[in-house]
Amino acid sequence: MVEFVNPKSLGELEENVVAINRVTKVVKGGRRLRFAALVVVGDKQGHVGFGTGKAQEVPEAIRKAIEDAKRKLITVPTVSTTIPHDVLGEWGGGKILVKPAEEGSGVAAGGAARSVMELAGIADVTAKSLGSATPINVIRATFDALTSLKDAEEVAKLRGVSLEHLAE
């Protein structure tokens, strides 16, 4: 079970609109247009969330998506500027492989996964999207990967090494 973070306990949250889709519903009288927004929010200090929103107008869809994202904030365990270990996340047809990277190498991730990593405050990471390239599937797979991460102390204990040797 994932524990969500209260957004009021955090500082300023940054938002990034990942995708806006125009959705059409065909009814007897013609077509009904709506907009669906996909947004990622984070504080760049280990907390990140994503949300979706639908509305008749784009700004309203974005506002709903931001509210949804703030309700689904998670904490991401980090070691210095990267993640503690390799992890594979899956959601639907989308898979993502996330690996820690050397300090100073930056975020090597494409599209939707990049915004999740940056807003989570992970500065050095490599991510490869496998399978579905749909932004929502990539983001959900990324969140699956990030929620299955173990914290650095737990990884060091499992491997039988000290915390200092883990970062090497």
UniProtKB/Swiss-Prot annotation:
GO cellular component terms given for this protein: small ribosomal subunit
Superkingdom of origin organism: Bacteria
Gene Ontology terms, MF aspect: rRNA binding; structural constituent of ribosome
One Pfam match: Ribosomal_S5
BP-aspect Gene Ontology terms: translation
InterPro entries named among the record's database cross-references: Ribosomal_Su5_D2-typ_SF, Ribosomal_uS5, Ribosomal_uS5_bac-type, Ribosomal_uS5_C, Ribosomal_uS5_N, Ribosomal_uS5_N_CS, Ribsml_uS5_D2-typ_fold_subgr
UniProt keyword terms in alphabetical order: Ribonucleoprotein, Ribosomal protein, RNA-binding, rRNA-binding
Domain called S5 DRBM: residue spans: 13-76
Oligomeric form and interacting partners: Part of the 30S ribosomal subunit. Contacts proteins S4 and S8.
HAMAP family: Ribosomal_uS5_B
Domain-level remarks: The N-terminal domain interacts with the head of the 30S subunit; the C-terminal domain interacts with the body and contacts protein S4. The interaction surface between S4 and S5 is involved in control of translational fidelity.
Family named by the database record: Belongs to the universal ribosomal protein uS5 family.
Task performed by this protein: With S4 and S12 plays an important role in translational accuracy. Located at the back of the 30S subunit body where it stabilizes the conformation of the head with respect to the body.
Name recorded for this polypeptide: Small ribosomal subunit protein uS5
